[in-house]
Structures are given as C-alpha cells and as structure tokens.
C-alpha cells in the first residue's frame, strides 16, 4: 500500500473490523464505538456478529426456546456471559465478608438496591429478620458508627423463617414461616421494618413469589398446598392441592405457576384453571429441590446431585449434568448457571457454569466452612450472599466496582 493510499480504520474490510472489535472493552464496544460512524453502528448492531461470538468465544450453544423468546437479544446475551466470566475469573479474586448476627440457620437471603445503595434482607430460624447494609460491610468493621445491621425485627414470626420475595416496583416484601403465616412488610423511609399484613395458610409456609400477576403473591406449604394471595386484601383467593407431599420449590411467570414437591412431581398449573396441571413430570429417583425460571428455560436442582435444564413450554429436557451428591440450589442468571451443591465427600461448594445446553464449569469456590442454606445473587452489583447453618452470612463482593468493568 503506497502513501497515495492512506489507511483508515473505517476503510478496512468488515471481517477485519469484526476481529479488531473483539480486542476492545466490551462495555465500550456496546455503548461508545457504535456512535463513531454509521458503518461501525451497522456492524455492532448485527445479531450475527454477537451470535458468532457466543458460539466461538464463549463456546455456548443456546436452546431454541431462549432464541425464540421475544426479549432475546444476542448482544445482551453475549455481554451477560462476558460479565459473568469476568466476575468469576477466580474465587480468590473477590472480597468475602463473614457477617454474624443471627443465632440460628439463615434459610433466606435477598439482595436488593434502594436509592443507589445495596442491601440484603435475611430471615432465620431464630425468627428474626435483619436488614444489612452492603456498603457498611464493605467499608470496615461492624461498629456503632458503621453498623452492618441497619434494621431488624426480633419477633418477625413465631416460627422458623423459610423464604422471602420482594416486589419489583417498591420496597415491600413478603416472608413465609413455619408458623403457617405469610406476612407482608414495608421498609420505611427511615429504614425501619414495618409489618403490614399477615395471613394463615393452614400449615407451615415454604416458598413465596410475587413475580406473577399484578397484585398477587403465590406461596406453597408443607401440606401440599399452592395458594394465591391478593396483595391488596391479603386473603387467599385461589389454591390447589395437586401435589401429594410438601411443595418445596416454586417459580412463577404471569399465569404460569411451576412447582415441585417431595412427591417427586414437577408441574405447571395455569393460574386461570387450578383443577389440573398443564404440564407435569414424575421422577422415580429424585425430587427437584429448586426451580429457577428465565427466558422460557426452567433450571432445576435435584436431590441426587444433578442439574437439569428444561424447555419451560413443554418440559423437554435440554441438558443434564452432575455436580455432586445433592444439589441444594440452582439459579438461572443471565449469562450463567449458579449452583450450590454437596460433593460426594459431603462438603459444599458454590459453582458457576456456562449457560445453554452444553454447560461447562467456569469457576468453583473452595469447600465452604459452614453448610450453606440459601444464596442470592444481584447481577447489577455482582454481589453474592450465602446464608449458612452456623447463623452467619457470607457477602462475596467483586474485586472491581460495576463502573470499572471492561
């Protein structure tokens, strides 16, 4: 090429530009580079560019049910995988904080943000709810000037607290307990925990979700019941007992209510017709200990140490992989499968697997010192919280802040 033919980046062949783009910071590639010129914008908004990177760089094959979901975008999917791999490069690269405070097993943790601040709610077998400030835990020791627990209710329930769920549009949240009640709560402007309502569902209440229809909360019980509660009147307005034993896992999306029980049945029931299941599966060897629903996919953990991914539209099995002797919890996150499992040596680890139908392990923790009960993960803050059997909570914080991601 002579001096009479100046080289300009914009004049390079598209194939070469696509290759060069893979070396740029991913956030910049999505938010800034498309604004440089029309040609860059065209290349970086082409679904084929991102789909190819998902297959070749991430080595992920996504199921058809996700690809056909109306909210699926290859660019967002690739970036979600990139963020997860960056977050979990190695377990040792993060900051792990052990937070004492409860006096019994912490069966429920729930991360959320309010006014650009990070918080965690925890519920325990000591019948107490605590509200934790993640910023204060990150900033230093738990002192009177820097309290980690910013609010608590020592008499929240008269039995063990099993689960929590929060409304997406407010600071209202819900709790279930061994005392057979479901309670609604509000975090006031000054940070206090205010009990709003309570309803008795007849037996120990287990799972809870408010991700279905507006103004409805769905819960399950140990006495085979799945109940729908009107959040305005806080009364049970519909229920079914299609399971034969305790209902221990729940996932809800719109009118679709997915449950699994100790009877080894997994089913989907339409909210508009509780008389019979639309879909069901019976497993002769193991029950599903957890359900996680996203983009037409249902990720399940099993009592015999497996993780199974289903097409939520028809219960077709998309993949199965083994993670130990017992899978405590599975979490289907944009860009990854998050798994808590017990090994054959009866030690627990937290693992991250690639999404899609050919999952590979990306990262794993060391053997956890305390037996975990439940975890939650916040994709916006990239924070992991683990409630433990020794009454502590682990807050696992990323090495870099979200605004420092590449």
UniProtKB/Swiss-Prot annotation:
- The reply on keyword Repeat is yes
- Domain F-box: residue ranges: 6-53
Q: Where in the cell is it found?
A: Perikaryon
Q: Where, by tissue, is this protein expressed? A: Expressed in several neurons in the head, tail and ventral cord, but absent in touch receptor neurons in adults. Expressed in GABAergic and cholinergic motor neurons.
InterPro entries linked:
F-box-like_dom_sf (IPR036047), F-box_dom (IPR001810), WD40/YVTN_repeat-like_dom_sf (IPR015943), WD40_repeat_dom_sf (IPR036322), WD40_rpt (IPR001680)
| GO biological process assignments | detection of mechanical stimulus involved in sensory perception of touch; mechanosensory behavior; neuron development; positive regulation of detection of mechanical stimulus involved in sensory perception of touch; positive regulation of inhibitory postsynaptic potential; positive regulation of mechanosensory behavior; positive regulation of muscle contraction; positive regulation of synaptic transmission, GABAergic
Query: Gene Ontology cellular component?
Result: perikaryon; presynapse
What is the annotated role of this protein in its UniProt record? Plays a role in mechanosensory transduction (touch sensitivity), touch receptor neuron development and synapse formation. Regulates expression of the protein snb-1 and the distribution of synaptic vesicles at synapses to promote synaptic transmission at the neuromuscular junctions of GABAergic motor neurons.
Write down what this protein is called.
F-box/WD repeat-containing protein mec-15
Q: Which organism is it from?
A: Caenorhabditis elegans
Organismal lineage: Eukaryota, Metazoa, Ecdysozoa, Nematoda, Chromadorea
